[in-house]
Every structure is written in C-alpha cells, then in structure tokens.
Amino acid sequence: MNWLKSTLASVAGTQEPIYGPEAIQSVAQQAQQTPYTELTKDDLRWRAYQYTNVETETFYVMADNGTVVMVQVIYSNIAGIHTTAQFNSKIFNLKGDQPHIWHSDPLYNFMFDENMLSFGADNLALTLNEEGTAYTIKSAVNEDSLVNLTFTRTAPGFVVGKDGTSYFGTDPANPWGSMMHAFWPRCRVEGTITTKEKTYDLTGRGMFIHAIQGMKPHHAAARWNFINFQTPSYSAVMMEYTTPPSYGSTVVNVGGIVKDDEIIYAGATNSATHTASAHDADSDWPAPTSIKCVWDGKSKDGKDVHAELDGPLGNRLDRVDVMAEVPGFVKTIAGSVAGTRPYIFQVSLSLATGGSVVKLTIGQYSPQEKLSLKLKIGAEEFSEEGSMFSEATFIS
C-alpha cells in the first residue's frame, strides 16, 4: 500500500504521506562499514533509468584568472514516458556590475555511446577518454556560449559508501526512489568559453559531479547545501540534503577532502550549518549569510581528520528562481505540486588561511577580507589559500 501511495504521489505530483525516517536507507549506513569507494571507469556510466528521474553531469571551473563557471548536461525521464535533455552554461560575474552569462538550451537528437560513457546531441559532445581520466565538453548549442573544455582528474574520484546511493521506500529490497552522487573533487581544467563579447580562458582547477535523483526532487529533498573548495594543494566537497517530513526530515551528508593526488578523507560524517541568515523577501526563504562546514572522519592510515570552514558568506552571488529560469521538463518534475518554490542561492568566495589556524573572513566582492579553512590530520594542522563555490537550495 505504501508503494502504491508513493507511485500515485510520483505520477500526480502530490505530497507524499508520512513514512518516517525508517523509509530512507541513507548512504551513511553503507559508510559505517565502507566509508568510500574509489571510482572506476565503469562507475562513470550514464544510467538513463526508464522511470521518473533527473540525471546530471556538472562541471565547475575555478580558473586561475578568477573566473567561476558551471556547465551541465541534464538528462530527464518523466514517468518512463518522455525523455528530455538540456545543456546549461553559466559564467558568473563576481563584480556584480553586470548580469551573469547564463544559457539553458534544449538538446535534440541526443544519444549515448554504446558503453554509456559519453553523451552526444546536435552540436554537443561530452566525451570520456579511453583511460577514463578526462572529460571533454564541446558545445555549439548556443552561439553566445561556445564551450571547449577538458577536465582531467588529478586525484581519485569517489562515492561515499559502496555505491554513493541513498534509497527511499518502506521495503529496503524494493526501493521506490534513490539519490546518488559521485565526485571527481580535483581536476585540471583547460579550454575556453567564447561569447559574442570575448573568449574566456578557463585554465585552472575544477570539480565534476555525477548525480541522479531517482524520484521527484521535491519528494527526495527539501533543503540542500553544496560546498566546492579548491586550493593549490587541497580540494574539499560537501553535498548535504534534508528530506521532507515524509522521510523524517533526515539529513544526508556526503563529502571528502583530497590533497594533490590522494584522498585524505571521504565519508558521511560531515555537517553544514547556516549560522546566520537574512530573510529574502522575493523567495520568502532565510538566505544564509554565514555558514559552518565540518568534515570529520579517518584517513586511510587511521588518523583523525577534521576540517572546517566557518564564517560569513559575504554578498550573495546570485539567486536563481528555478521555476522561472529552468526549462519546462524540469518544472514538470520539480514543480508539479502547487506552491512548490525551489530557490538556489549561489555564493562564490575567496578563502585564505595562513600560518597557525586563525579565523579569517572574506566577502566575494572584497577579496582582501578572508575566510578561514582549518584542516587537522592527526596532530598536524594545515592551511592554504583557495576559493569556494557554495549553493544553498530551498524547496517547498
């Protein structure tokens, strides 16, 4: 009967009943025995499930010249009946004096290669190399945003637990939904995006995330926090979501820290806290103004690992009203409940620390101010200057 209720809610877009926290098998349960699993080439396959889901491959760039960029392929299936694909690109204006360069374009004649490792469409190719260590993204889908980028993994990728997936449903053997994240937290980026005005050199560092929401997004999560932190030596990632009351408002947090070419820590014992917020009149949500992120766990050799980012976020980089800006197929999935209002608050900051572990703060428009990164491995403390991209998402 619970399966039937969930199916009806998925098809009709209605709010789900209260199943309770026992109806989500969090990936944190896997991580108790297997904190993380390094990705192989086969793990990078597109799933293309034949039921309601949204599958994304998202690439974040933090260029050496300070430019922050996101490019993304979205593959969506609605009720096993209709599939759609979209290509998004966004060049952020960190000064705040001009609009961001944001394009979201439908894809036509899209397909996967026979191994489900690469994706193509008219005027678009997202290709994984033979070694499984680099993606090339080439897009002429929009003449105002010509993309030619290569992301080369410089540290191992990982999923938390055995498969990076939390499962939803009252019968663990037959889940009716899922949520998966896989990370390449540290990449070398080469290439450009060319607009009508200029060509952006995007040489620098990046992160790649493969994500699958195997159910309607507003059924899986009501809140999200995402942190992407890059320094010359370290990368840290955190993806946290809180389920709706249907699943007990359960918090699931996956993330990790890498240094150069090795994973220092990855697991599910992390936290993200909005330590201060301000009411956003347009969205009617408490937009975060300060955040504290903590990574806690063990290194491969059994040392305690503790990392922390704590401080003000500075001026908001952007507020995206998803219902106003995303294509219709995403609205159909994310907004089929009357009153659903997803908002994504995006913040880009420069981060710096130096010497001993000292708290520093910076807003995105004031790079001389600093925010503190604290990293402790065993008895050793480390700190390093870098950059952060953060998102806070609210869905009701």
Curated annotation (Swiss-Prot):
Provide a GO biological process annotation: ER to Golgi ceramide transport
User: Looking at the UniProt record for this protein, which Gene Ontology cellular component terms does it annotate, in alphabetical order?
Assistant: cis-Golgi network membrane; cytoplasm; endoplasmic reticulum membrane; nucleus
Function summary: Ceramide-binding protein that may transfer ceramides from the endoplasmic reticulum membrane to the cis-Golgi network membrane, and is thereby required for the biosynthesis of complex sphingolipids.
- Signal peptide from the UniProt entry: none
Give the record's keywords alphabetically. Answer: Cytoplasm, Endoplasmic reticulum, Golgi apparatus, Lipid transport, Membrane, Nucleus, Transport
Name under which the protein is recorded: Ceramide-binding protein svf1
UniProt cross-references to Pfam families, sorted A to Z? Svf1, Svf1_C
Bilayer topology: Peripheral membrane protein
Q: Which residues form a coiled coil?
A: none
